[in-house]
Amino acid sequence: MTALKVGSESWWQSKHGPEWQRLNDEMFEVTFWWRDPQGSEEYSTIKRVWVYITGVTDHHQNSQPQSMQRIAGTDVWQWTTQLNANWRGSYCFIPTERDDIFSAPSPDRLELREGWRKLLPQAIADPLNPQSWKGGRGHAVSALEMPQAPLQPGWDCPQAPETPAKEIIWKSERLKNSRRVWIFTTGDVTAEERPLAVLLDGEFWAQSMPVWPALTSLTHRRQLPPAVYVLIDAIDTTHRAHELPCNADFWLAVQQELLPLVKAIAPFSDRADRTVVAGQSFGGLSALYAGLHWPERFGCVLSQSGSYWWPHRGGHQEGELLEQLKTGEVSAEGLRIVLEAGVREPMIMQANQALYAQLHPLKESIFWRQVDGGHDALCWRGGLMQGLIDLWQPLFHDRS
């Protein structure tokens, strides 16, 4: 068979996203491709194509920024790395005409963060990869799952929901703002007995990566009980950064204003042991804060990549919530908690490990998971479903 000429039309038609080759039982060599729409270097003004892979080349790694290399005389850019056989994560490309974003040969963490902040608004998904969505930072990303990546319950066999989610507008007197909220119900159990799950960053789980098919699938397979799901929009990054980190007003507004509104539409159980609060990053911090401060209402906490360093971004001081646990100001006694963090988000992992060590005496009701991934919704979506399964498992015994 004649080899295709690199950069020819037929060569590009043979490409369907990243390609990998097994190196050994644990590692693969992975090559990424991008086609320059301006053509070869003779015609193109593109100087760099940055590769932003969550948990591999992002600012969490404090690593040298990585750029694709052009194959001379062609419209082909490529970049090769090595990934674990069980790795899963999202990535994007950032073509740019500038070559001065990262000035130092080895930028420090702050410069890395600032450089990526400037570049990411220009990020694009991989045009060769059909699996893409709008990430939490607002830019497009694509999915990469290596052959031995762990199963993600519900996402492996999604089912269309019988009833669509209902979108409402919550106008909060306490918070003095308005936002969208999505209400989703599954199953046909007696309404007042249905458990409740509150999902933070609701617009992401409702629109960018809709959870309805995965929840429907797991309910049909009896891995999740019939339930009511409430997805709360964060409004924008400014409101998110103010309302989610340890904010009593936000959670009082949820309890006093939003939940009665939801209950009139979709009745649910008031029992704390049937109620889950789930969140990621600031949302993970917020979920545990709610459980620790209102355990009579929120008895189950699902925290993924929780920002337990808050409010000390450098990671050199213990976060506020951990300090409160250590001094006895709050207690996790009686809560069921799922705590998950990625090995490729070092500062987040360190803070979560410190928190887990503090919670470890309650190990019967703590589920601790380390994921081979970064600060990444593609990882979180599987942990979200598994976390709901773990936290609500006792309900199946209640009904039997």
PLM features: residue spans?
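Aromatic-rich carbohydrate-binding modules that target alpha-glucans
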Residues: 2, 23-25, 29-86, 96-153
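Short beta-strand segments enriched for Tyr within beta-sheet-rich domains
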Residues: 87-95, 194, 250, 254, ...
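Short beta-strand element of the alpha/beta-hydrolase
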Residues: 182-185, 192-203
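Cap/lid segment of the alpha/beta-hydrolase catalytic domain
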Residues: 198-266
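Active-site nucleophile loop of the alpha/beta-hydrolase fold
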Residues: 202, 234, 302-311, 343
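Primarily recognizes the serine-hydrolase "nucleophile elbow" in alpha/beta-hydrolase
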Residues: 210, 270-324, 330-331
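The feature captures the conserved acid-bearing segment of alpha/beta-hydrolase catalytic domains
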Residues: 309-378
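Post-His helix in hydrolase/transferase enzymes
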Residues: 379-389
